[in-house]
Amino acid sequence: MKHKRLSGLLALLMCSVLMAGCAGMAAIDDYAVNEGYELKVSSSGTGNKAGSGKSTPGISKDKIKVGVIHLSDPAEGSGYTYTHDIGIQGMQQNLGLSDSQIVRKNNISDTDADATRTAIKECIDAGCNIIFTTSWGYMQTTAEMAEEYPDVYFSHGTGYMSNGRNFNNYFGRIYQARYLSGIVAGMNTRTNRIGYVAAMGSDSAEVTGGIDAFALGIYSVNPDAKVYVKVTNSWFDPQGEEAAARTLLNMNCDVIAQHCDTVYPQTLAQEKGVYSIGYNSDMSKEAPDACLCSVTWNWSAYYTSAVQSVIDGTWDGSNYYGGMNENLVSITSVASFAAPGTQEKVNEAKQQILAGKNGVFDGVIETNTGATVGTAGKTLDDSTITGGINWYFKTVSVVE
């Protein structure tokens, strides 16, 4: 999702930061304040941003207890919650924690602050000393609970709030993998009409930035292809996601990509005999004859480092923004039935990204309104990528 997601408010905040002089790819140290909480966006490279700079008391591994708040049930399939829980399981295995040291709260609506508060409080009452809240809508309640319980560590996924002490934010450069998946789509469409099921519209920089990165990847290999976006206005809506995919198929789109939580766009593509691009985890198992590749998260990379920092006493409230170099985001191998040369083209572009020679949002970029963003010879900075992309690339159209 997910989730979840930079809002128009964040974009406004970031605009003020940019006007103050942020630009380029140099290391940044940008802050904005929202209701008393410090907003921090990490620089590229290491994936971490300095927090308070103060060390914290370590907690012995046998005393660690981890809480995780999930939007849905991990057992539901290959979507967002499943992927986060695979990351939690990976962390547990990496650190040698027992099952009793993990407390899960599933099916917690991120639009219900009372339910979120109750779930977090139950984790605290169960003895959890670090709690991960995985969906955008948990952000405000997580921030409030962090102030109420300063001795508990809180880590919120996909938002922007943090306090530099016991509450941080984590997300990743998923746009890098989106770009690569765009190359795959662009090399395999026959109609030059590619569909994209999007959870949110242009007020979400996370979703819109992903669409633009995808479209830029397509454009790099097939400038004649167009991207058609259908928005569901929900992070998790199985029926709505399938309906959106069906609309795009009816428009003669022959590749369906997605930024939403379930596998329904994939299974519909499988049923209708067209190609698809999965998201969150490898969705080829649900759509073996359709899925060309999947844009994936390896959340265990972050969860392991975060819990280890609490054990070691090195937690400092840093925000985390990892990418391909940190093994947080990637795409799966291209399907054997893809067009010849697809995997080779992806490999070439991936090496350029890893080497810092392709920042995805490079140079002057033309939007679908005819306006331009960016500067020749420069890459959009992290503040803009995470909070200021409310425009669509010139090959993108939104379907009403």
Predicted regions and their residues:
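Repetitive helical segments and hydrophobic/amphipathic motifs
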Residues: 13-14
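C-terminal motif of bacterial Sec signal peptides marking the signal peptidase cleavage site
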Residues: 17-21
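Bacterial N-terminal signal peptides that target proteins for export
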Residues: 1-10
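A residue-level marker of the well-folded mature domains of exported/periplasmic proteins
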Residues: 24-400
